[in-house]
Amino acid sequence: TIEKSDLSYGYYFGCVLSNISCFESDLSNTIFSNGEINNFFIKKSNIFGTSFTNTMIKNLLCEDIMPGRWTTQLVNKHLGYRYTGVFKTLASIDDKPSRFEILIPLVQTLVRDNVKLNNDVYKELNKFMHDYDKTSSEMRKYLKSINECMLLIKNIVHQD
């Protein structure tokens, strides 16, 4: 268990990590590369810019990955900045279910905090929400949440 720790800018190459719970910690810009992660639970932790390059992920669970209250300005800055933002994290995850373990609580948090997204951030988020195989058996458990989130994100875009 990792609790209230600063692991930002860490680098884990070729590691096999199993049964890890991470609470109220900073994982921002941490790199997991050429390894394997089994049963990783992240709660109330910062994952902006965390990268899972060439890493096999089995059972990533995320809950409240944007702890605290988030303002429109803060979210658009941290979410949209491609090199350190959460989109870098999502793009590095090949495993679609793991992506949605991050996307779904992310959208729910944005709605909770009444955040309005910049248009470019909205388009990018929308692209990730649509990036799944509707016939995949492992995606079926996410479909209801994905559809709900896609409806919700239409309400959080800045109307230019």
Residue spans of the language-model regions?
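Intrinsic low-complexity/IDR segments
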Residues: 1-160
